[in-house]
Amino acid sequence: MFEKVNPAHPDKVADRIAGALVDLAYQKENNPKIAVEVLIGHGICHIITETSVTLSPDEVAAAVSRIAGNLLVDYREVSQDEHLADNQIDGIHCGDNGIFKGVPVTDEQKELTTIAKKLYETYCSDGKYILDGDRLILCQSNAQTGHLREVFPDAEINPLGDWTGGTDVDSGATNRKLGSDMGDSVTGGGLHGKDLSKADVSINIYAWLKAQETGAPVELVCAIGNDAVDGIPYERIVETARAFIDRIGGFEKSAEWGLIC
């Protein structure tokens, strides 16, 4: 069984805003340190950023407006904790403790992701979908159930009726849709809104890529400050993750569909 949400789901909107701010930080420095938390809904977007670079309120507001529309932006920026900053002075080290399990993507997960993308291309609005064997559940906002039934005659469609969705009727928060992003993979922390020094980003990506390459689960553990994980230099893990993010198109882009894209 698998659940997939599209980029217009409020939680993914929060992830995308967080990713956009990380992209901004990387435009200012090659290796910034940044962690972004976003809570959005009902006309307001709260953002707290711990960062080594300064993001102007205008830059932040522009990113929110582009992704989520005209909202009141409540932005709080603080400097990165000095102990965490010191951890990176003499090289790239794991920015936190963590457990990570990369798992190969299943045919079911690929199939549902294809369906989700097809619906998003058509409606470009909030949607959440489940596939469990032969059972397909489609919750698609701003769509007529009858039209969806023509394409998916055997699906359970909008069980409570047609709906509008989005941040006007629901709230969203960063890293709340990791099942959609990662499938059967496991993480102790969130994937989005963080720079590449954060193990939650780089080791998750590395483990997931290795699982796809080998066809078997990959389990890794790290402690904050480690310069190697399972005998692999952490710098190499970070560069592998950087190449993946660059290939996708940046942190905001990677937040749209997660690792299963």
Q: Where do the protein language model's features map onto the residues?
A:
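A domain-level signal for the structural core that forms small-molecule/cofactor-binding pockets
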Residues: 1-261
